[in-house]
A protein has these predicted regions:
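Helical "lid/coupling" subdomains associated with nucleotide-phosphate turnover
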Residues: 1-6, 20-180
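Ser/Thr-glycine-rich phosphate-binding loops at phosphate-binding pockets of nucleotides
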Residues: 12-17, 77
């Protein structure tokens, strides 16, 4: 991200990592067992149980208090698919996901719909592969709980992940600075 200022979250299959980020400085982070696969397993596939589990963990994440009014940066495949679905639903004209941004007031009702298991009824569901659709609701639950607690001004999505970040970190600093 170009000059990030907010809280970043990386949702994997087993965990959700949250950390404060400002420019090139990354603050201390926390890990919660809220990855899509793990959340689904812990809840026995129940969306209502998943919401309770996510709310319990997120309510303890004091780190999110520092994000109020800033940006939440969403990283991870399930969250990328939520962005892709939203882009299809609003008929977003560009096929560029990196730094795609949804204002908080728009993100909440969208995520609530997906978290209820209604993704199949959203225009644009065809953009998400069938084998990825089953985790959309669990990813939406985790993201919804995080942003409702944090109250960011918006959610911004990354087209890249940890792998790309690691490769970027291997570049010499002068080369890193040339890439916005």
């Amino acid at each position: 991200f170009h000059k990030p200022d907010g809280i970043a979250g990386d949702l994997g299959g087993g965990s959700l990592e949250l950390f404060d980020v400002k420019d090139r400085n990354i603050g201390a982070g926390i890990t919660m067992p809220l990855g899509g696969l793990r959340l689904s397993d812990m809840a026995g596939g129940s969306l209502s149980k998943a919401q309770k589990i996510a709310r319990e963990h997120v309510s303890k994440a004091k780190l999110l208090d520092a994000g109020r009014g800033r940006v939440f940066y969403a990283v991870g495949g399930t969250w990328r698919n939520l962005a892709k679905l939203h882009m299809g639903a609003v008929h977003y004209p560009l096929h560029v996901m990196h730094e795609y941004e949804i204002p908080f007031a728009e993100a909440v009702p969208y995520l609530k719909k997906v978290a209820k298991g209604e993704a199949a009824n959203i225009d644009g569901i065809h953009t998400v592969s069938k084998n990825r659709q089953s985790l959309l609701a669990f990813g939406a639950i985790a993201l919804l709980e995080v942003i409702e607690r944090m109250q960011p001004r918006s959610v911004m999505f990354s087209a890249l992940g940890v792998r790309e970040g690691y490769l970027y970190s291997l570049l010499p600093e002068d080369q890193q600075l040339t890439d916005p």
